[in-house]
């Protein structure tokens, strides 16, 4: 229009302004990152100043630092400086009130950003989730065998198939789905445990969190409060949680209606053995409000991620050491026929337990353990000061220490089995044991309370798998090298194996094992 003509000279500026502002923001962010980044702790050796190097090869940096430094040392990471503390100090620190679980994990989990609420739920120091698992889930385990047995059998049949000829599968994806089904059967029951929308959420949210955290680490700290709104990975997290709330809300409404109906008739409301009820009951007892859907996603994500990784590693190890398969099957068949599905039966499966524990040692998921934040200065027995505000974690070097594990590079499925045969050692060296030479589940007051459920779930699934299927690597292929990211080690997502139903019928009925004698 003619009356705009005098201002046409401003048109190029109108287009250039957003680019100019974006450029200035980026420059300012890099300035802040360079000049206002967290400072390392004084008087503790620095092994690496390069946070990009930690991003690429943190696993190796930890190993190198352990060999070079006799005590603590520091590594610069994308979320600040980390102090690696030798495992010999874990006993003196395990009950120290100045070490916070939440403060040790909040920065790495990015809990202040929308979309990461499930991580925030897992990182609190208030013991809510620990109470749900320790009091509600663990004390209900004896009532859950039938659900875990049934869902693992049905899920394996549907996912792994019933073919008696070799089929090639991407086993990690399939195991993720099976574990999600079994875990959801326990946490939520029917119909959600077989609802594909729910299964997609709990399986994919773990992957999405990993990818979102990776992108956030690659983003300069000063830009994160802005950039996270636009990253596809963080958008996906928010979508997952919205979908989870949509699915969980009707279940909450049903529970609320059942409670109101019971009270209206003067009855005590019936307790339900599922995560929704557990969380409502614990939150009411603690006088706090929670987002139930977020906490259910958090609990599911934690359980599925670890169990899937261990289960996948177990199957791959069966391919690499097939000589152990017949002995494992013989133990499972004998004990199930003798005592059926009980806690004591699982306890007596010493060879299976030893096999799983050795898999976790040989294919450790993390090179470090027990992230903690110092809320006050902490002084170690050798005089090292861990300053207030610093983040520490312990090395897990004993799993490869010849003094604790002779010939540590060798996979020995009998390793813990032999140790438990020694007098006075029968109850030690178990998969669920908390020991300084086996810290897969942490140590001290924040040790994983869900390890007993993981133990039961893993053993039931492995019993089912071993009695029904044969497995091998794809002919001509080797086990692929694990993926290393920071201090984590993971099975590659595209790993393949071949599976077929065994030529003979299972020697024991998993639903009624004693009647099979």
From Swiss-Prot:
Pfam families given in the database record: p450 (PF00067)
Keyword Transport: no
GO cellular component, one term: membrane
Membrane-traversing stretches: 16-33
Ribosomal protein keyword on record: no
Gene Ontology MF terms in the entry: heme binding; iron ion binding; monooxygenase activity; oxidoreductase activity, acting on paired donors, with incorporation or reduction of molecular oxygen
Pathway noted in the entry: Mycotoxin biosynthesis
Record's keyword terms, sorted: Glycoprotein, Heme, Iron, Membrane, Metal-binding, Monooxygenase, Oxidoreductase, Transmembrane, Transmembrane helix
Enzyme Commission number(s) from the entry: 1.-.-.-
Binding site for heme: 448
Membrane topology: Single-pass membrane protein
Cofactor(s) required for function per UniProt: heme
Listed InterPro entries: Cyt_P450, Cyt_P450_CS, Cyt_P450_E_grp-IV, Cyt_P450_sf
Subcellular location: Membrane
BP GO annotations: secondary metabolic process
PANTHER family: CYTOCHROME P450 (PTHR46206), CYTOCHROME P450 MONOOXYGENASE AUSG-RELATED (PTHR46206:SF2)
The protein's role, per its UniProt record: Cytochrome P450 monooxygenase; part of the gene cluster that mediates the biosynthesis of the diterpene glucoside brassicicene C. In the first step of the brassicicene C biosynthesis, the bifunctional diterpene synthase bsc8 that possesses both prenyl transferase and terpene cyclase activity, converts isopentenyl diphosphate and dimethylallyl diphosphate into geranylgeranyl diphosphate (GGDP) that is further converted into fusicocca-2,10(14)-diene, the first precursor for brassicicene C.
Similarity-based family: Belongs to the cytochrome P450 family.
Protein name, UniProt field: Cytochrome P450 monooxygenase bsc11
Native organism: Alternaria brassicicola (Dark leaf spot agent)
Primary gene name: bsc11
């Amino acid at each position: 229009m003619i009356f705009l003509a005098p201002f046409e000279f401003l048109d190029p500026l109108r287009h250039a302004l957003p680019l100019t502002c974006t450029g200035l923001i980026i420059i300012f962010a890099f300035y802040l990152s360079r000049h206002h980044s967290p400072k390392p702790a004084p008087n503790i050796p620095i092994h690496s100043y390069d946070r990009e190097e930690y991003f690429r090869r943190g696993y190796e940096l930890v190993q190198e630092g352990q060999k070079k430094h006799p005590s603590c040392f520091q590594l610069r990471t994308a979320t600040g400086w980390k102090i690696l503390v030798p495992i010999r100090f874990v006993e003196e620190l395990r009950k120290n009130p100045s070490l916070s679980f939440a403060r040790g994990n909040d920065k790495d989990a990015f809990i202040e950003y929308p979309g990461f609420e499930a991580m925030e739920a897992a990182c609190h120091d208030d013991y809510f989730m620990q109470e749900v698992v320790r009091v509600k889930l663990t004390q209900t385990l004896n009532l859950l065998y039938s659900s875990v047995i049934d869902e693992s059998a049905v899920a394996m049949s549907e996912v792994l198939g019933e073919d008696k000829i070799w089929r090639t599968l991407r086993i990690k994806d399939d195991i993720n789905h099976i574990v999600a089904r079994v875990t959801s059967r326990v946490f939520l029951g029917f119909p959600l445990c077989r609802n594909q929308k729910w299964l997609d959420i709990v399986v994919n949210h773990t992957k999405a969190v990993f990818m979102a955290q990776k992108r956030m680490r690659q983003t300069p700290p000063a830009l994160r409060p802005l950039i996270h709104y636009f990253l596809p990975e963080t958008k996906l997290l928010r979508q997952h949680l919205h979908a989870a709330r949509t699915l969980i809300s009707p279940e909450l409404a049903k529970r609320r209606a059942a409670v109101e109906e019971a009270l209206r008739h003067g009855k005590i409301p019936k307790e339900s053995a599922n995560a929704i009820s557990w969380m409502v009951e614990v939150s009411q007892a603690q006088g706090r409000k929670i987002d139930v859907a977020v906490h259910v996603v958090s609990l599911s994500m934690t359980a599925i991620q670890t169990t899937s990784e261990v289960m996948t590693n177990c199957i791959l190890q069966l391919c690499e050491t097939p000589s152990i398969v017949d002995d494992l099957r013989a133990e499972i068949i004998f004990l199930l026929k003798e005592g059926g599905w009980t806690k004591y039966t699982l306890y007596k499966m010493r060879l299976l337990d030893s096999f799983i524990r050795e898999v976790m040692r040989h294919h450790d998921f993390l090179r470090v353990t027990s992230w903690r934040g110092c809320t006050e200065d902490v002084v170690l027995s050798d005089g090292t000061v861990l300053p207030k505000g610093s983040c520490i974690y312990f090395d897990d070097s004993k799993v490869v220490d010849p003094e604790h594990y002779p010939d540590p590079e060798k996979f020995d499925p009998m390793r813990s089995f032999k140790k438990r045969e020694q007098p006075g050692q029968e109850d030690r060296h178990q998969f669920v044991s908390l020991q300084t030479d086996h810290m897969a589940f942490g140590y001290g007051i924040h040790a994983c309370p869900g390890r007993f459920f993981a133990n039961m779930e893993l053993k039931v699934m492995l019993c089912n798998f071993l009695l029904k299927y044969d497995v091998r690597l794809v002919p001509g292929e080797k086990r692929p090298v694990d993926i290393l990211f920071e201090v984590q080690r993971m099975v590659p997502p595209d790993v393949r194996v071949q599976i077929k139903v065994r030529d003979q019928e299972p020697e024991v009925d998993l639903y009624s094992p004693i009647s099979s004698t």
